[in-house]
Amino acid sequence: MKIAFIAHHVNFEAGPATVTAHLVERLCEDHQVSVFSNTINGIDLLKVKYYKVPALRCPKSLAHITFLISSTLLLAALSLLRKTDFDIIHSTGYDSAFSSNVITSHFCERECRRLEEANIIKIQCRSVWQKLKALDHRLYRSLLCFVEGLIISRSSSKACIVVSQAMQKEFARHYGDAAKNIIVIPNGVDTLRFHPTNRLFYRDQIRQKHGVSRSDPLLMFAGGDWERKGVRYIIEALPLLSKRNVKLIIIGSDDEKFYGQLAELKRVRERIIFVPHSSNLWEYYAASDIFVFPTIYEPFGLVIVEAMASGLPVITSRVAGAADLIIDGVNGLLLRAFSDVNDLAAQIELLLSNAELRKNMGERARETAEQFSWDQVAQKTLEVYNTVLNRPDLEKLRVNVPERLQKISHRGG
């Protein structure tokens, strides 16, 4: 099969770029794979054909517009010159989605815009620079909402993949019958790289590096876009904990100055460690005791599954897409509401006060994560490709989480 992937970035670091990289890495072994992207890292270019797509790096809105135009023109030119004859053109996002017959959406743009307009997700405007970024963000969101609407309206001629049942429901709510053929394939996790045995190698090393003693309980958060992902709620929960030696490590980049000031206001600044983006997250999972992710909106949340694969108990909100994989109280804990700081503090206290519960929950989390390997994701994606090429009714194909995990519903506030 001749497969082309179109993605702004392809790497093994974070987000949609990681999903694309894992698919490319696996499918190129048995298929002819081409990659159209602005940047690519970690992929053996002897096994794939790479097309560099020119695009601006910033601002975000222009970066996506220029990539959309460039990739569309490049594919059109190659087609006119008869240089390509792809069976599948897979866009992992809305970048050049007009040229593709398979699309993976990692975000319901219309749902995110609804939350922003309702001020549930707050766009920061504390400085002139942030006001300019907010303007760019609104342009970017409007562009992607427009493209998303066009793509979903044409979904009868394309296969549209989303990464969680929550996203499937969001598309149905916003687009009605036009979204009926959407397919759910949850993201995977590298269960060898993210493994409980990493504690033997990295736990003491990372703790010493950041001045955390062996006896200090360590909470972990990882990701960008801290307002959307609920970092403020973790900081607000810290002073409510009975143990004063609980530390929080925040990995990622955002407005560190603001959140540092919030921590000072709550008198917990000395208990928080800010770490810029790390490409070795498995080392930090190994050093931590609990992974906390009280997100306001998260279509999936790769970091949740990575933490589970690492054997960590996870506390997250019910609106996270990866909450599909969690049975509350068995392999993780689900908050009543993302903004319920008292509930968050109580859940943390529950785990910190019971080492046996932490251990058992971490083991069950690992067992769940093992069901979501990237090999399985690649196989399910190939099933979609075959369905597209044979063109039977897409309605018959549904790739969801294991049936036993669907027995408990946890969607809500």
What does each model-identified segment do?
Residues 277, 296:
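Aromatic "clamp/platform" in nucleotide-sugar-dependent glycosyltransferases that forms part
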Residues 205-208, 343, 350, 357-371, ...:
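A short, well-ordered alpha-helix in the C-terminal region of glycosyltransferases
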Residues 17-22, 217-240:
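A conserved mid-protein helix/loop that constitutes part of the nucleotide-sugar donor-binding site
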Residues 166, 188:
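Carbohydrate-associated surface elements
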